[in-house]
């Protein structure tokens, strides 16, 4: 089913400060940040040509969206195999699923201190187990029911391969004790439905309070080969700055362990739930086909949603992401490819609303409402071959859409209005003096884009600005002048080309191709 949600209208103040162009125009007003960037030599206006482009070649059908109708609470419940026979055992922490958290004497010592002796964990093995069974079979210093339906885990819980743990509607709340160092590890199948999962301070009898990135918070991690399903309940107060302990994580094992275990990639559905006050609201690494649908991510610490390294075919849809305290609302980073970021609402985040980062390609970013973020609406860093379609980018503190060192970016039918800098901004930046690993995260100082349809209105410095593009194609974009007193004018490399551009775009209703008449590689010599 190809359902394209018609985004709710947003009330905008009228912007009547310039001339409305019927089709498109291009502005080269460089935002202030550009002067501070180290970049390869740029080309002058004499080194660019303006010609008519093929309108037919720019035609593109609306993108086909994935069918979301099957991702429901009922479908999650139907996946649970309630086969009896699961076993519960307490054992020492020295197990494969815990190696990342107990390796080295320093980390093991932490659990010894927290548990007051040689550390143990609870292991779910061999079949289906409901959470209430743990309280009936384990001592209170490991797991207890404190009030009817409210349980506290005082040691880590591990779901072993082949086992299923169901935390369901008979559980009001599962609390993971901060003082005792409890956390939840899925190495099999985990279902959390109609209940609450929270990091808990027994000392304060309250949810754990964030005290800094290095202070322990409980967390949930699901390893390679696992399935994780969270449906219709809140998750809160989890995660800290330790590998794979970021909050709610679905991740392949480390490369060394993966070579030995050869587990398939993990997957899962997180639907219709609330994730709040978590170090990373969501994190994944080398995960496939994960679905994040209909969730609220609010007031999380570093990121709201953060899929990472080589994850594929993710669906990030119909989520509400806001109030992220340190960085971005939604970010996909390092070769997160072939995924859908659609019909989300992301606003009031510390930096950008949506980010594609570090060679994340062949993704669709469509029909999102992105507004009042403290940096850009949508940002692309070193991420080429992506389609940006039908988004509404309103009143962001910097650019509506920004792309750096990214080529073949198709920007169709977007509304980018009253952003404080530019509606659409493309630029290059030389990153060679930074500390990034260029083998892992290569870059090329090139930018190119196609802009078709949509509207750029009332943005602070210019509708569109670009720095030394490989090529630009423009067609059928409505524009109002920026709020600056000089109105809508071409500057920079296109200043001398203004008459040619307007003649094609406005008078002759043509598509415009702007590209260099010299080889950019030669121009940099």
Swiss-Prot record:
It catalyses: [(1->4)-beta-D-mannuronosyl](n) = [alginate](n). Residues 1-29 form the signal peptide. Pathway: Glycan biosynthesis; alginate biosynthesis. One of its GO terms (biological process) is alginic acid biosynthetic process. NCBIfam families: epimerase_AlgG, para_beta_helix. Belongs to the D-mannuronate C5-epimerase family. Catalyzes the epimerization of beta-D-mannuronate to alpha-L-guluronate during the synthesis of the linear polysaccharide alginate. In addition, is part of a periplasmic protein complex that protects alginate from degradation by AlgL by channeling the newly formed alginate polymer through a scaffold that transfers the alginate polymer through the periplasmic space to the outer membrane secretin AlgE. This is Mannuronan C5-epimerase AlgG.
């Amino acid at each position: 089913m190809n359902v394209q949600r018609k985004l709710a209208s947003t009330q905008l103040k009228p912007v009547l400060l310039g001339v409305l162009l019927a089709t498109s125009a291009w502005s080269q007003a460089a935002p202030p940040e550009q002067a501070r960037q180290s970049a390869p030599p740029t080309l002058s206006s004499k080194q660019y040509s303006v010609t008519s482009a093929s309108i037919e070649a720019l035609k593109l059908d609306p993108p086909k969206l994935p069918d979301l109708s099957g991702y429901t609470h009922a479908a999650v419940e139907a996946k649970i195999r309630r086969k009896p026979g699961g076993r519960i055992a307490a054992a020492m922490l020295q197990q494969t699923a815990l190696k990342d958290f107990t390796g080295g004497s320093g980390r093991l010592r932490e659990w010894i201190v927290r548990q007051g002796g040689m550390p143990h964990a609870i292991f779910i093995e061999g079949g289906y187990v409901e959470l209430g069974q743990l309280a009936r079979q384990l001592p209170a210093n490991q797991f207890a029911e404190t009030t009817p339906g409210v349980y506290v885990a005082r040691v880590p819980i591990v779901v072993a391969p082949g086992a299923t743990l169901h935390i369901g509607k008979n559980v009001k709340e599962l609390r993971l004790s901060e003082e005792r160092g409890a956390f939840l590890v899925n190495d099999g199948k985990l279902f959390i439905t109609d209940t609450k999962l929270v990091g808990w301070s027994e000392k304060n009898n309250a949810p754990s309070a964030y005290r800094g990135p290095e202070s322990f918070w409980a967390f949930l991690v699901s390893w390679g080969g696992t399935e994780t399903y969270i449906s219709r309940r809140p998750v809160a107060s989890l995660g800290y700055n330790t590998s794979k302990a970021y909050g709610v994580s679905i991740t392949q094992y480390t490369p060394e362990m993966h070579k030995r275990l050869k587990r398939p990639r993990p997957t899962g559905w997180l639907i219709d739930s609330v994730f709040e006050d978590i170090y990373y609201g969501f994190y994944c690494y080398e995960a496939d086909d994960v679905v994040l649908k209909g969730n609220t991510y609010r007031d999380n610490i570093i990121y709201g949603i953060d899929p990472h390294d080589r994850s594929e075919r993710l669906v990030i849809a119909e989520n509400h992401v806001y109030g992220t305290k340190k960085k971005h609302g939604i970010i996909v980073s390092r070769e997160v490819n072939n995924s859908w970021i659609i019909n989300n609402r992301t606003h009031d985040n510390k930096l950008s609303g949506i980010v594609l980062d570090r060679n994340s390609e062949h993704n669709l970013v469509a029909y999102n409402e992105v507004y009042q973020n403290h940096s850009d609406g949508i940002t692309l860093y070193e991420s080429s071959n992506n389609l940006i379609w039908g988004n509404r980018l309103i009143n962001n503190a910097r650019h509506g859409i920004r792309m750096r060192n990214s080529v073949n970016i198709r920007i169709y039918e977007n509304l980018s209005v009253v952003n404080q800098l530019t509606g659409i901004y493309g630029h290059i930046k030389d990153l060679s003096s930074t500390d990034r690993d260029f083998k892992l995260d290569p870059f090329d100082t090139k930018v190119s884009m196609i802009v078709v349809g949509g509207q750029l209105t009332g943005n602070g410095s210019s509708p569109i600005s670009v720095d030394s593009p490989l090529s630009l194609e423009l067609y059928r974009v409505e524009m109002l002048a920026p709020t600056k007193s000089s109105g809508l004018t071409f500057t920079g490399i296109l200043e001398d080309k203004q008459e040619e551009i307007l003649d094609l775009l406005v008078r002759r209703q043509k598509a415009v191709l702007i590209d260099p008449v010299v080889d950019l590689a030669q121009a940099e010599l």
